[in-house]
Regions:
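C-terminal non-catalytic regions of proteins with extracellular/luminal or membrane-system context
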Residues: 1-424
Length: 424
């Protein structure tokens, strides 16, 4: 019998399986089965999920490992977050490395990581969801055309971004936070990939900001200073290499904002956790430490209130609500939000000592009311809201009611005569 590629795996101690997905401008994937070509018989539920051929390749490597020993490593050569829960669940896979289309030169760095010449220190720039199609941002995606517009013109479609600000980790971590806190109908079945009550562990494989290394680190939030006058937040974090391999570590500074009754009444949406800034150590030998100082711009923690009065005499301004602001560090957004929950007394897998609070005594709509050059901020592009043309058409999601406002798909909408004139 002629040897096959599967047989060749028996001759190698380490098997590297590469899974790839390309993407580009106007080259994204429609989520769920809508993005799958049924004629290819790939047995996919999402184009960013595994095909049978990819499963076969991974399983062949795992089978060879079981027979001959060694390791199985899966490389994700992609720019779009894939559905990889089944790889994570495969006990025969020893490691997954997300490399992100590094190109020919970048693969020298990948080889250095695989060989152990360097320790990885990167962190994920997106949430790896179990099912992409369950996300609120996936409900309005693709070519959603007007029902009555001219099909020969180029601008014959519109996407209603009904998910509001809740994209990526700002959705998953905020809904998780509200589920733990028992608020906003967050545990309802709407948006659940399983059809049962929404549960974070059923929805997320790897969180935003998560990363691993060949060594271990301990981070300590030494102190934190909020300087409202100079509009900065400064954190000093001591990082110690507690493992046996030299490596670098990333310090991520997050903030959790107060979500108030004012916000709910005025349509101000806030993520339960958001990245403020980050820094990175030099290479630390085993046992060595370094203090990383992060100075973040406070405007990154201000929220837009489209109903607020402003210095221009119109509407729209950045605000800071009165209340407690929690600052924390962590290996990704999920660890960070758990630190905040722990500090607030919730029974979660978090470290309360890695979170520090700062209290703003009164509502602030003046600190960020003007730009750096003194121009008053105000609402812009209000006519980009479909409701400005077709009142009452769209409902935008709010964390005050996940169940009642989870996005529906807005397709085959009928454009008004005024809109048709503009489109033509």
């Amino acid at each position: 019998q002629n040897a096959t590629w599967k047989d060749s795996m028996n001759d190698n101690n380490v098997m590297i399986v590469t899974i790839a997905r390309s993407a580009s401008e106007n080259g994204s994937y429609n989520p769920g089965t809508a993005g799958v070509d049924p004629t290819q018989n790939l047995n996919q539920t999402d184009p960013l999920g595994l095909s049978d051929d990819e499963r076969d390749l991974i399983n062949a490597a795992v089978t060879a490992k079981a027979a001959n020993g060694g390791k199985v490593i899966v490389l994700l050569n992609n720019v779009s977050a894939m559905e990889v829960q089944e790889i994570e669940d495969n006990v025969g896979v020893d490691a997954i490395l997300q490399v992100g289309l590094p190109g020919g030169y970048g693969f020298y760095g990948v080889a250095d990581i695989l060989s152990g010449a360097v320790s990885p220190s990167g962190h994920l720039t997106d949430t790896y969801a179990v099912k992409n199609a369950s996300a609120p941002s996936a409900q309005n995606f693709g070519d959603l055309q007007w029902a009555n517009a001219n099909p020969d013109i180029s601008m014959n479609d519109a996407i209603v971004e009904a998910e509001n600000i809740y994209i990526g980790y700002k959705y998953y971590e905020t809904r998780y936070f509200d589920t733990v806190m028992g608020q906003g109908n967050a545990a309802s079945t709407v948006g659940s990939s399983t059809g049962s009550a929404w549960n974070y562990d059923d929805e997320v494989t790897y969180p935003f900001g998560y990363g691993l290394s060949y060594t271990t680190f301990e981070q300590t939030l030494d102190n934190l200073n909020v300087d409202l006058e100079n509009e900065t937040v400064t954190a000093n974090v001591t990082v110690k290499n507690t493992g046996s391999v030299a490596g670098k570590d990333v310090v991520q500074l997050y903030v959790s904002l107060p979500y108030t009754d004012y916000d709910k009444e005025h349509g101000v949406e806030k993520a339960a956790i958001q990245l403020l800034d980050y820094g990175k150590t030099a290479e630390l030998a085993p046992g060595a430490s370094e203090t990383v100082t992060i100075t973040a711009d406070m405007q990154n923690m201000a929220s837009w209130d489209s109903t607020a009065d402003n210095a221009a005499g119109t509407k729209g301004c950045y605000i800071l609500d009165a209340g407690d602001y929690w600052f924390t560090i962590g290996n990704g957004a999920h660890e960070a939000v758990n630190n905040v929950l722990a500090a607030e007394g919730q029974s979660v897998d978090g470290s309360a000592d890695k979170a520090k609070s700062w209290t703003l005594d009164s509502f602030d709509d003046t600190t960020f009311a003007t730009t750096k050059n003194g121009t008053a901020v105000e609402n812009q592009l209000a006519d980009m809201d479909i409701n400005s043309w077709l009142p009452g058409t769209a409902t935008y999601m709010t964390r005050s009611d996940w169940e009642g406002t989870f996005p529906k798909t807005y397709k085959n909408l009928t454009a008004s005569d005024e809109m048709l004139d503009i489109l033509d």
